[in-house]
């Protein structure tokens, strides 16, 4: 069977000169908080002034992180591209507890399979990711996100970079106005 060509749509919004990279793990509560602020940040700061790039930071203590990250990137290969991926991220964020283990080691998800997780994502997001999840070399995109984070010394989520420099003093609890102010000065 011949494999069809595919392309993962970059998770990038805005087209301004200031680049804000956000390293997120989709089930991390702090990443979820940061993710929830990105649309408002883009609106406040201006699409012509900043560019937001989401980098996926899979973390093994979030037990289904790898499956969920693959679903997000699979969604980015579909007709909706980055917006489909964003819908998957939003669905996971809105139902975070249903994709996580209690204290990272127990609870109902012990009995969940990757197919169960995919079905939940499809049900909540309305994005049919199952077929794209099976793209054999989709792992090259996953590995790119991992390698990019590692080369930049990123170990936790969320982590923020402005114009290629890690901003260790920025956090998900910061006000959107503070993020915007920081991005727009320079």
Model features per residue range: what roles?
Residues 2, 8, 22-44, 111-186:
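C-terminal cap of thioredoxin/glutaredoxin-like
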Residues 7-16:
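Short beta-strand-to-loop junctions in surface cap/lid or active-site-entrance loops
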Residues 13-14, 71, 156:
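Glycine-centered flexibility motif
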Residues 15, 58, 75, 104, ...:
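A general structural-boundary detector
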Residues 17, 68-69, 126:
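Residue-level signal for cytosolic alpha-helical hairpin/rod architecture
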Residues 21-26, 32-115:
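Structural alpha/beta surface segment adjacent to cysteine/selenocysteine redox centers
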């Amino acid at each position: 069977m011949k494999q069809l060509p595919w392309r993962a749509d970059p998770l990038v919004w805005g087209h301004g000169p200031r680049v804000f990279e956000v390293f997120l793990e989709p089930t991390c509560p702090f990443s979820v908080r940061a993710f929830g602020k990105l649309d408002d940040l883009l609106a406040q700061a201006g699409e012509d002034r900043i560019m937001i790039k989401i980098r996926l930071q899979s973390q093994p203590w979030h037990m289904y992180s790898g499956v969920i990250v693959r679903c997000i990137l699979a969604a980015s290969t579909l007709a909706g591209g980055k917006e489909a991926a964003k819908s998957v991220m939003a669905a996971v964020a809105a139902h975070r507890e249903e994709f996580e283990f209690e204290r990272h080691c127990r609870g109902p998800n012990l009995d969940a399979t990757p197919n169960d997780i995919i079905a939940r994502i499809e049900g909540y997001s309305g994005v049919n990711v199952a077929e794209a999840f099976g793209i054999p070399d989709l792992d090259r995109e996953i590995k790119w996100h991992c390698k990019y984070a590692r080369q930049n010394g990123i170990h936790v989520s969320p982590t923020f970079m402005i114009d290629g420099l890690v901003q260790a003093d920025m956090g998900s609890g910061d006000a959107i106005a503070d993020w915007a102010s920081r991005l727009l000065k320079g």
